[in-house]
């Protein structure tokens, strides 16, 4: 079971955390973080249709570890998507909880980003140019959905289920999941690391309390959708992008 955890994380968010830490060390030893910029959702090709193809392939293949995690949960623990709340049985309630969490975490995220920028501990974020192609916004929304499903299913449903089976204390699962979530955002600076670690702790507590991952997927999708699309529209006014 430990190997299953290692395999899933090594193919996905654990790998991202390692690269993020290395990227952070590269940046922090190069120049002050406040003077650097982190680009998000960059084009993958200068040729539009190949860029679209690469973007869609990237989204599709990034979800393979989710399928692997669901398979391991079913095979080793007898848990299907329904048992971890990854379903559409309660769309209204899940959407309401997701929207509430989005509002609470979104304000905190903006605040930590602003503080990090003011203290020079967070890089400037450069977001996608929405005027690029007609498919830019749909692909960004698909990317937001990809991140939401990948992170919440793996960080909560998969990791917590396997942790319980290994008799790991809930507080240790909560702390480990939160720190890992912060780690794969560390490439953006200290602010996003702290913000995402706090978000991981809050989401983890909500999942432990109610046992449904879908509201957290919805909240995460809304956060990323605003981050990818909304900030491209209002970003220059609040110091993001431009």
Q: What positions do the PLM features span?
A:
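N-terminal, membrane-interfacial amphipathic/helix-forming hydrophobic leader that caps
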Residues: 1-83, 228-242
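Residue-level signature of transmembrane alpha-helical entry/exit and packing/kink sites
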Residues: 1-8, 51-63, 93-98, 136-140, ...
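Transmembrane helix-loop-helix hairpins at the membrane interface
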Residues: 13-17, 102, 106-110, 114-242
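Generic hydrophobic, helix-prone segments enriched in Leu/Val/Ile
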Residues: 21, 25, 52-57, 91-95, ...
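Juxtamembrane helix-boundary/capping and inter-helix hinge elements in multi-pass membrane proteins
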Residues: 79, 89-90, 165-169
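Residue-level preference for alpha-helix termini and adjacent loops
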Residues: 80-85, 126-129
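Interfacial segments of alpha-helical transmembrane regions
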Residues: 83-107
């Amino acid at each position: 079971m430990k190997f299953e955890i290692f395999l899933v994380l090594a193919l996905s968010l654990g790998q991202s955390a390692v690269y993020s830490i290395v990227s952070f060390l590269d940046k922090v030893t190069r120049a002050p973080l406040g003077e650097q910029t982190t680009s998000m959702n960059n084009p993958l090709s200068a040729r539009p249709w190949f860029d679209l193809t690469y973007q869609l392939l990237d989204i599709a293949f990034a979800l393979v570890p989710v399928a692997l995690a669901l398979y391991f949960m079913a095979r080793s623990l007898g848990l299907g998507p329904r048992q971890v709340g990854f379903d559409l049985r309660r769309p209204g309630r899940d959407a309401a909880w997701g929207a509430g969490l989005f509002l609470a975490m979104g304000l905190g995220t903006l605040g930590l980003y602003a503080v990090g920028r003011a203290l020079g501990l967070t890089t400037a974020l450069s977001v996608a140019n929405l005027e690029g192609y007609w498919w830019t916004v749909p692909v960004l929304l698909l990317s937001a959905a990809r991140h939401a499903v990948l992170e919440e299913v793996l960080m909560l449903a998969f990791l917590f289920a396997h942790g319980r089976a290994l008799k790991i204390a809930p507080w240790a699962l909560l702390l480990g999941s939160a720190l890992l979530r912060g780690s794969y955002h560390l490439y953006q600076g200290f602010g996003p690391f702290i913000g995402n670690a706090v978000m991981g702790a809050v989401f983890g507590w909500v999942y432990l309390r109610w046992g449904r991952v879908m509201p957290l997927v919805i909240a995460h999708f809304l956060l990323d959708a605003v981050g990818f699309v909304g900030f491209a529209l209002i970003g220059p006014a609040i110091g993001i992008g431009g």
